[in-house]
């Protein structure tokens, strides 16, 4: 192909000469002036709730720590001043805590007793279900064995049938009668270059190199053409 129809580029003209027309090559034009974003990828969404929850938890921890420090300072001040009201308050809180512990222990004991009773009933039902599943598995195993034996019998029968049909030596014609086997002759038996015994040769036969006048060719003509 020729390129005479195309305009001459600036590199071909030289440095001194400048292009008089406004034709530019596509490579000299500005390219990739805008970014292309893929449409099949979605922008990741930032979940701000998780960050807010973390900040709130940190604030709660700080407030709790500050409250504990303030309580300890108040206790120390009451001890130094000789104020017995804080001692009474502390003793009350200790008594309340002990009462709560006793109540929790009672609830735990009641729950543990209920769980033991429920677990006992579950064990009984579980034993029954295990016995049923064991019986079902035994039945399934028996069914699988029976099906396997039937399939093996069918395969053996099919093999025997195939051998009887395919192999003529295995075919049985009758108990008293002898089998009449028909062995198919090979195509090599009717060739012109078959090795024949000297006893079968007749005195009248004469050897010839002419394939058209040979005995094989004459037999072929009489069989298929004449």
From Swiss-Prot:
Positions with biased composition (Basic and acidic residues): 7-16, 78-92, 102-118
General function of this protein: Involved in pre-mRNA splicing.
Coiled coil: 126-167
Intracellular or extracellular location(s): Nucleus
Disordered: annotated span: 1-31, 78-134
Xref: InterPro entries: Cwf_Cwc_15 (IPR006973)
Superkingdom in the source lineage: Eukaryota
Compositionally biased region (Polar residues): 18-31
Organism from which the protein derives: Debaryomyces hansenii (strain ATCC 36239 / CBS 767 / BCRC 21394 / JCM 1990 / NBRC 0083 / IGC 2968)
UniProt family annotation: Belongs to the CWC15 family.
Biased amino acid composition, Acidic residues: 119-133
PANTHER family per the UniProt record, alphabetical: CELL CYCLE CONTROL PROTEIN CWF15, SPLICEOSOME-ASSOCIATED PROTEIN CWC15 HOMOLOG
Pfam families (alphabetical): Cwf_Cwc_15
Protein name: Pre-mRNA-splicing factor CWC15
GO biological-process terms attached to the record: mRNA cis splicing, via spliceosome; mRNA splicing, via spliceosome
Keyword Nucleus attributed: yes
């Amino acid at each position: 192909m020729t390129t005479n129809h195309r305009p001459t580029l600036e590199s071909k003209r030289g440095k001194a000469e400048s292009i008089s027309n406004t034709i530019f090559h596509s490579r000299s034009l500005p390219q990739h002036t805008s970014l292309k974003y893929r449409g099949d990828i979605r922008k990741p969404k930032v979940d701000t709730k998780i960050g807010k929850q973390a900040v709130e938890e940190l604030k709660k921890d700080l407030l709790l720590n500050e409250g504990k420090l303030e309580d300890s300072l108040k206790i120390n001040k009451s001890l130094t001043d000789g104020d017995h009201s804080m001692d009474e308050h502390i003793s009350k809180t200790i008594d309340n805590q002990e009462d709560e512990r006793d109540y929790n222990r009672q609830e735990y004991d009641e729950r543990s007793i209920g769980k033991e009773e429920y677990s006992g009933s579950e064990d009984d039902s579980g034993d029954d279900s295990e016995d049923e599943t064991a019986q079902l598995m035994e039945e399934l195993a028996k069914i699988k064995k029976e099906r396997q034996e039937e399939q093996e019998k069918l395969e053996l029968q099919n093999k025997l049938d195939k051998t009887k049909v395919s192999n003529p030596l295995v075919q049985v014609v009758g108990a008293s009668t002898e089998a009449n086997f028909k062995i198919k002759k090979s195509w090599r038996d009717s060739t012109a270059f078959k090795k024949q015994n000297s006893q079968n040769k007749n005195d009248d036969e004469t050897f010839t190199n002419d394939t058209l006048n040979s005995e094989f060719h004459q037999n072929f003509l009489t069989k298929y053409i004449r």
